[in-house]
Amino acid sequence: MPISLPKVRGIYRYSVLMSKITWLNVGGQADILFKPRDIEDLIYLIKNTKLPISVIGATSNMIVRDSGIRGITVKLGKEFAYIKYKSNNSIIAGGAALLSNLAYFAGEQQVSGLEFLVGIPGTIGGGIEMNAGAYGSDVASVVQSIKAVNLSDGNLYEFSSKEMGYVYRGHSLKGQWIFIEAEFKGVSSGHEVILHRLKEIINKKNKSQPVRGKTAGCIFKNPRAYQAWKLIDGSGCRGLNNGGAKISKKHCNFLLNYNNATASDLENLGNKVRNTVKDKFNIELEWEIRVLGSH
């Protein structure tokens, strides 16, 4: 019996192979991929379906399992990729805008404080969800307000940064959300000064991370008072492989699809590293990469 879906203005795609979309080039089929036309379209879908809903962004920090994703997978499209200057060093960005584009836009507006975002792959929505950060700064320190739709009731909410209850690489909101828009605040600075800082960050990233490989950013969060890469290295896991998956030799908190890996290859290798670190140091590493889909 065919599935009955709400009549939306956006686009439904069916049986979408996620390995064609994700940065790691792994993942089975998503039953239904939905790109809403606007916020009202998204809300209408959520309020009028009983199917499970998942959310993806740029998929730059994600493993989609080989079994794929059941139900509806929502991905915000170009309609949500806007970035615009407001006033007084404030910038509004849609949930699908890239963090790196926000950093460059801020530079053009002579707004400093957002430079760290240039080295973080992913979207505004994903960055808000995980409190993305680098080089001593994070989203929580520069975001002012956030608009989000709740995946349970389909209602639109607005939160201040304080109300988000931000913690290291996460927030304290209950339930599941899709982040639609955010306002960011920086400070005035010269364009050339900001441009120099952007170049510094990119150069540092290129030297220290496997930017040309199929990767999904840092595998694990840094435990309190420790650096994950040092624990991984100290456990002898640098360069470790499993099937087509490998721990990067350049930066060992990065997981690589170097030879047609499956999602299972990658996830199993990550768990092997976790177990090895636990045995060696009695410290439990927590995934920073999001794993989506059923076993």
UniProtKB/Swiss-Prot annotation:
GO BP term, pick one: cell wall organization
Pfam families: FAD_binding_4 (PF01565), MurB_C (PF02873)
Any one Gene Ontology cellular component term annotated for this protein: cytosol
Keyword tags: Cell cycle, Cell division, Cell shape, Cell wall biogenesis/degradation, Cytoplasm, FAD, Flavoprotein, NADP, Oxidoreductase, Peptidoglycan synthesis
Necessary cofactors: FAD
Catalytic-site annotation from UniProt: R169, C218 (proton donor), E288
Residues in FAD-binding PCMH-type domain copies: 26-189
Annotated GO MF terms: FAD binding; UDP-N-acetylmuramate dehydrogenase activity
Record bears the keyword Transit peptide: no
Compartments (UniProt record): Cytoplasm
Keyword Cell wall biogenesis/degradation: yes
SUPFAM superfamilies per the UniProt record, alphabetical: FAD-binding/transporter-associated domain-like, Uridine diphospho-N-Acetylenolpyruvylglucosamine reductase, MurB, C-terminal domain
EC number: 1.3.1.98
Top-level division of the source organism's lineage: Bacteria
NCBIfam families, per the entry: murB, PRK13905.1
Family of the protein in this entry: Belongs to the MurB family.
Protein name, as recorded: UDP-N-acetylenolpyruvoylglucosamine reductase
Species name: Wolbachia sp. subsp. Brugia malayi (strain TRS)
